[in-house]
């Protein structure tokens, strides 16, 4: 069973003006597809092509670096499309909102900490909000296509991701050029907090 490109849950232009249609078209149809093609090549003839991608990543230290890079790329982008929405809200509600306030002091303080992690990630990578094994919310950034599920990230950064932001240049350069902070600020307008809340509940 080969891995395949998931369909976007919205049109390429649906996130404008925050994320432009051309970026979405290239990011989803070209970059994400390339990770899938390379992942399928890396797992061909092994038992990995029958495993869920999350299960592979939890033990990714056992596999070739191509599985880490391209498996991470596939998982991360599939995750990213799901936590974006044209109907982005002002912020989280319910238990996830309470957990964010309890951990970070306020939603605004959380946004500042998350945005700082995304802004200061040197080179390519991701910023994450994740549920640690003690059920506490934490923020980290990871290089390349790593994520908190992987057993190759530092122990203190391991857990279940519930919100992520791609800060590779291909995610924003067409529209924002070198203005990464503007892209990060725009991201908050298209976060699907209902999806984040659902993933939070699943991670507990």
Predicted regions: what they are:
Residues 1-204:
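Feature for soluble, non-membrane regions of globular proteins
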């Amino acid at each position: 069973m080969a891995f395949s490109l998931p369909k976007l849950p919205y049109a390429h232009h649906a996130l404008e003006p925050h994320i432009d249609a051309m970026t979405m078209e290239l990011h989803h149809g070209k970059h994400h597809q390339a990770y899938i093609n390379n992942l399928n090549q890396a797992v061909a003839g092994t038992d990995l092509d029958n495993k869920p991608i999350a299960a592979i990543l939890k033990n990714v230290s056992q596999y070739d670096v191509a599985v880490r890079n391209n498996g991470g790329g596939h998982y991360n982008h599939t995750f990213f499309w799901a936590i974006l929405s044209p109907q982005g809200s002002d912020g989280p509600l319910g238990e996830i909102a309470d957990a964010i306030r309890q951990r970070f002091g306020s939603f605004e303080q959380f946004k500042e900490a998350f945005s700082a992690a995304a802004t200061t990630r040197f080179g390519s990578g991701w910023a994450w909000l994740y549920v640690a094994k003690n059920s506490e919310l934490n923020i980290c950034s990871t290089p390349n296509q790593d994520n908190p599920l992987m057993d190759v990230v530092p122990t203190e950064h391991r857990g279940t991701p519930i919100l992520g932001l791609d800060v590779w240049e291909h995610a924003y350069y067409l529209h924002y050029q070198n203005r990464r902070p503007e892209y990060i600020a725009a991201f908050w307008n298209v976060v699907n907090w209902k999806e984040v809340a659902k993933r939070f509940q699943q991670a507990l």
